[in-house]
A protein has these predicted regions:
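Carbohydrate-associated surface elements
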Residues: 135, 157
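Conserved acidic donor-binding segment of nucleotide-sugar-dependent glycosyltransferases
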Residues: 290, 294-301, 310-316
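Aromatic "clamp/platform" in nucleotide-sugar-dependent glycosyltransferases that forms part
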Residues: 258
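Conserved donor-binding/catalytic core segment of Leloir-type glycosyltransferases
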Residues: 166-184, 190-195, 204
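Membrane-proximal helix-turn-helix segments that form the acceptor-binding/catalytic region
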Residues: 110-129
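Short alpha-helical donor nucleotide-sugar binding micro-motif in glycosyltransferases
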Residues: 237-238, 245-250
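Short hydrophobic beta-strand element within catalytic cores of glycosyltransferases
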Residues: 275-278
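Glycosyltransferase donor-sugar binding loop
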Residues: 202-220, 236
Length: 348
């Protein structure tokens, strides 16, 4: 018997950010390896702040779906409580939560409260909730009223790659991956690197610069003000299939995020044998082990600068962490898709 499900996503599934990569890879594995027939539903752009017309179209598209399991990405699900309430009796709704919407950095108190209330109302209507980390699952139970009995954790998968030893001298190549938005902490990273002008380093930032024009403009202006334009490159959005060479050429991955629901970029760096500097925010401590990286408090410029100085100056310490990274075995996408499929099967 052919197993069927719908997977509703906000906008273009090809967007190269972590949540969309997760959706895309799970859909691909369900379809190709596990023989599910997946109907991908585009809910439109602009989430979590869709225009009225987009919201109406999204609700209509969801209502028109057959009554098999319907997975709705949390970026949209959390702001469609009216659709969730209408469809809860007729459809097996599955909310896929990458991280609670209210925890995005840079929100006003009013916006955060509105998103929290909306997402809480929507999640009450889900037949089941899938969180992408145990950290997110705990938040959903504690703050959003999600009962543990209707909650599963399915972390992202990670592609397994060959990661050769590193002990390179000369200019240290730093890599940061993630959209240029307040939550990623690029302002903290640039401030820390500004203190290390005497050391040999170059930074490449790979991430969409269009999601927050204000943040991107501010970051470029600060880089110029500090005289770092010849040492920091912003590549913009990079397709997933083009990321591996960036990881392979990097000596050190650094991303001082203020929150991560999982932290796929950290896992990708570790899978490529790249030592990591991250923060203690959200799920990052569960993704980055002490053998593979070092963590500092979010927004702590002094601590970040100290760890950067220590690792930029010491190839041996970088290689020790790189060896730890090479020993880490994350689950594959096929393994995680099988877990995802078991959740859907349990709703039959």
């Amino acid at each position: 018997m052919v197993r069927k499900a719908a997977f509703a996503v906000p906008g273009d599934l090809a967007i190269p950010t972590g949540g969309y990569v997760y959706d895309r890879r799970i859909i691909a594995e369900l379809s190709a390896a596990l023989a599910w027939r997946i109907e991908v539903v585009d809910l439109g752009d602009g989430f979590p702040y869709p225009a009225a017309g987009t919201r109406a179209t999204a609700c209509a598209r969801l209502a028109a779906l057959p009554r098999h399991p319907v997975v709705i990405d949390g970026l949209a699900f959390g702001v469609l409580p009216e659709a969730a309430a209408t469809l809860r009796a007729s459809h097996r709704l599955v909310a896929l939560v990458h991280h609670p919407l209210a925890l995005e950095s840079g929100l006003s108190a009013a916006d955060a409260a509105s998103l929290r209330a909306s997402e809480r109302s929507a999640l009450v209507c889900a037949r089941h909730v899938i969180a992408t980390s145990a950290t997110v699952a705990r938040l959903l139970v504690a703050d959003y009223g999600v009962a543990s009995g209707r909650l599963s954790v399915v972390e992202p998968g990670t592609d397994r790659v060959s990661a050769p030893p590193r002990n390179r001298e000369g200019v240290v190549k730093l890599l940061a991956v993630g959209s240029v938005i307040p939550r990623k902490g690029y302002d903290v990273l640039v401030a820390a690197l500004a203190r290390l002008g005497h050391l040999p380093w170059r930074l490449v930032i790979a991430g969409d610069c269009g999601r927050s024009q204000q943040t991107s403009r501010g970051l470029r202006a600060e880089i110029a003000r500090l005289g770092l334009t010849d040492r920091i490159s912003l590549l913009g959005a990079v397709a997933s299939e083009q990321m591996s060479p960036l990881y392979t050429s990097a000596d050190l991955f650094v991303l001082p995020s203020r929150f991560e629901g999982y932290g796929m970029a950290y896992a990708e760096a570790i899978a490529h044998g790249v030592p990591v500097i991250g923060t203690t925010a959200g799920a990052i401590p569960q993704t980055v082990s002490a053998d593979a990286g070092v963590l500092v408090a979010p927004d702590d410029v002094e601590a970040l600068a100290a760890e950067l100085q220590r690792l930029i100056a010491s190839p041996d310490q970088r290689e020790r962490l790189a060896a730890g990274a090479r020993a880490v075995k994350f689950p594959s996408w096929s393994e995680q898709a099988a877990r995802f499929a078991r959740v859907l099967e349990s709703l039959a």
